[in-house]
A protein has these predicted regions:
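Conserved acidic
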Residues: 17, 21, 25, 94, ...
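Amphipathic alpha-helical packing segments from all-alpha helical-bundle domains
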Residues: 101, 122-147, 152-167, 193, ...
Length: 200
């Protein structure tokens, strides 16, 4: 099941079966919206404009999406799915290794995302994005003694890790990704090391 469905964004929508052709059609709409977001805020964009940019029809649009917000969520979901797959398939073995892959992914896309965020500043770093970042937890939880935590403690631990990562990511983007992915990964990993040393 795709993460988009898991988060309930497609619940109740009239989605067409996601065959290979269906996925390609769906992708046309998300890419069309991405193009428009580089010049306009989402509040200014209409379904008609998305349809025209995708060279499609409203009838086809509503087979896959219920609204422009639905397309926006799908675009964000696709982006984080791609990042997740990159990290998941990496050869990293440490938290810092995974962070290098994570920050490298986003830096490669900075120019395009920066253009979008000039008109939609809160699009990339929001509750949806934070929810997606939490998907990395099974990949990295073995790096810490999380078995010592009860259910509530583990939930707070995830909030600590991924809430912090989301804010660091947002700050890095706001500063134009001036630091390299390797430097960013080291900074974040070093913060964790300092925290652990303070306990000893």
């Amino acid at each position: 099941m795709r993460a988009l469905d898991t988060l309930g964004f497609m619940a109740g929508s009239k989605t067409a079966p996601l065959t290979e052709r269906g996925l390609a059609t769906r992708k046309k709409f998300t890419l069309a919206l991405a193009d428009l977001l580089c010049s306009y805020s989402v509040s200014e964009i209409t379904v008609k404009e998305i349809v025209v940019r995708a060279h499609s029809t409203r009838q086809t649009f509503y087979r896959y999406f219920t609204s422009k917000e639905d397309v926006l969520h799908a675009l964000l979901a696709d982006l984080y799915d791609e990042c997740y797959d990159r990290v998941l398939n990496s050869s990293g073995t440490t938290f810092e290794d995974y962070l290098v892959v994570y920050f490298s992914f986003w830096r490669e896309r900075y120019s395009r995302l920066h253009a979008i965020m000039q008109h939609n500043p809160h699009w990339l770093f929001n509750e949806v994005a934070y929810t997606y970042n939490r998907r990395f937890y099974p990949k990295i939880k073995g790096l810490w003694a999380t078995e010592l935590l009860d259910e509530r403690g583990e939930q707070y631990f995830q909030n600590f890790i991924f809430g912090g990562l989301s804010h660091v990511h947002a700050t890095w983007f706001a500063q134009g990704c001036a630091q390299s992915p390797e430097d960013m990964a080291h900074y974040v990993a070093q913060c964790w090391t300092i925290y652990k040393q303070s306990e000893e």
